[in-house]
Amino acid sequence: MAEPVDLDVAGPVGRPVLVVDFGAQYAQLIARRVREARVFSEVIPHTTSIEEIKARDPLALVLSGGPASVYAPGAPQLDPALFDLGLPVFGICYGFQVMAQALGGTVAHTGTSEYGRTELKVLGGDLHSDLPDIQPVWMSHGDAVTAAPDGFEVVASSAGAAVAAFENRERRLAGVQYHPEVMHTPHGQQILGRFLHDFAGIGARWTPANIANALIEQVRTQIGDGHAICGLSGGVDSAVAAALVQRAIGDRLTCVFVDHGLLRAGERAQVERDFVAATKANLVTVDVADTFLAALSGVTDPEGKRKIIGRQFIRAFEGAVRDVLDGRDIEFLVQGTLYPDVVESGGGSGTANIKSHHNVGGLPDDLKFALVEPLRLLFKDEVRAVGRELGLPEEIVARQPFPGPGLGIRIVGEVTGQRLDTLRRADSIAREELTAAGLDNQIWQCPVVLLADVRSVGVQGDNRTYGHPIVLRPVSSEDAMTADWTRVPFEVLERISTRITNEVPEVNRVVLDVTSKPPGTIEWE
C-alpha cells in the first residue's frame, strides 16, 4: 500500500510545536489547544530521541502529563540534554515534574494529593500576569515539586503544591502543575497562549487560510500531472478533501459517490445536489448496494463488517476506474482521513488500536492507488474551518459527522435490506425532530442504532408486540477524541420516541445512551 504523505509544515504554516506524550489521556487535547492558539502541533512519544527531535526542527516543546510517579521503576524519564537544544519548553503536570527533576529541582511524594478543582494563588511572574490572583485550576497529582531548579521563579502555589508553576524567561522555560488544557481551568488557554506567543515568540500562523494554502500545495506536489479519484460519503471530511484536491488539480479529479446501500434517507440526492453545486467537480455515482449486502451477509462481528466495507469500498473504486472512467490512468485515491481516525486505529506511536476505521485500517494490502489524505493531521473543527475558507456552504461544512461505513455499523447484528429500511426510517425521524428543535449546532452527532438481534415485549392497542429497540446516542464533542452525552430536552426525546414507535412497526422501544467517551466510543461498532 502506498504510504500517505503527511502535511509539509515547513511551508507557509511553519515548523511545529511538538507535544511530548508521557502517557497522558489529554495529550491529543493539548495538541488541539496549541492549534487553537494558531500554532501547528503534533504529538510524539516520550521515547523520541533528541536527534529525532532536532530533525523535526520544532519551534517549541510541550511536555504532557502522565499517570506515573517520577520515582516509580520504569517511569518515563527526560534526558537533561533536551534543554541544551535551546528550545522553549512548557511542562504540564507530570511533564512539569520531570522537567523540574531534569533541571536539578526537587520532586517529592508529599502525602498531599490534589485531584479536581483547586484554587491557585498567583505569586508573580509573567505566565499569569493580568489574570486573577486567585483562580480555579484542574489538578491531578500525587507527587509535587518542592524546590524549583536554580534560576527559576516560583510564580504560583496551591494548598497541595508550594511550587505550582515556575518560569525562566531568559531560557524561555516554564511549567505548571495543573492542567491548562482542560475546560475546568478557565484561564488555561490564555496561559498556554502566553507561553507560545510571549515566551516562545511564535506567531499565530496556523490559520484556515494558511492551512488551506499549504494543503493545496502539498496535494499539487504529490499528484503532479497525475489524475485522482475521490470517494464522497456525503460527510464534511470527504467533501473538504475533495474540494482541496479540486483546487489543486482541477478537472483531473473525478469524484465518485459509492451508493453502498448503507446510506441514510435522502443522502444520495443531497450529495449529487449540494456538493456539485458548491465545487463544480466531476461526479460519478456508482450503485453497488447489492454487492455490499452480499459481502456483509451473515457477518455480525463489528471489525469484520468494517474491514469488509473498506475492502468493498476500494473495489468499487477500481470498478469505477474500469467501467466508468473510460480507462483513463487514475493513480491516486483521495480520502478524508482525520487525525482522530489515525489515533483510534493505532496510527500514533504508543496508541492502542481501539477500532479499525474503514479508511485507515480496513484497506486491502493490494491497493491499486496511492493514497492522498490531505486532512490526515487535522481535527474536525479545523476541517470545517478549511471548508469555509474554500467557500463550501454551511449545508456541507456544518453537517454532523457520519461514518464512512454508514448504517452498516449502526446495526448491531447482521446487515440486511429489511434491517436497513427499519433503521433508515428511525434515523430520519430522529434527525427531523432534532433539526426542528434547533439542536443541530448543539449536538456533535446523534447515531441512531438498531439492536437487530434483540427483541422486547411491548403492547400497542390491545395487541402484544415483540419488536426491536432503537438506541439514541446524542453526543457533544470538540474533536471526537472525547465526548459526553448531550442533554436533549425530554419533550424532544418524547416526540422522537413516539414517532418512531408509531411510524416504524418493527420498533417498539426507544432507549437513550448516556455513556461518555471514554469509556464508550461514539459509534456502537
Curated annotation (Swiss-Prot):
Pfam family, one: NAD_synthase
Function: Catalyzes the synthesis of GMP from XMP.
UniProt enzyme class: ligase
Gene name per UniProt: guaA
Residue span, Glutamine amidotransferase type-1 domain: 16-205
Catalytic activity entry: XMP + L-glutamine + ATP + H2O = GMP + L-glutamate + AMP + diphosphate + 2 H(+)
Subunit structure: Homodimer.
Recorded GO MF terms: ATP binding; GMP synthase activity
Active site: 93, 179, 181
Pathway participation: Purine metabolism; GMP biosynthesis; GMP from XMP (L-Gln route): step 1/1
UniProt cross-references to PANTHER family, sorted A to Z: GMP SYNTHASE [GLUTAMINE-HYDROLYZING], GMP SYNTHASE-RELATED
Name of the protein: GMP synthase [glutamine-hydrolyzing]
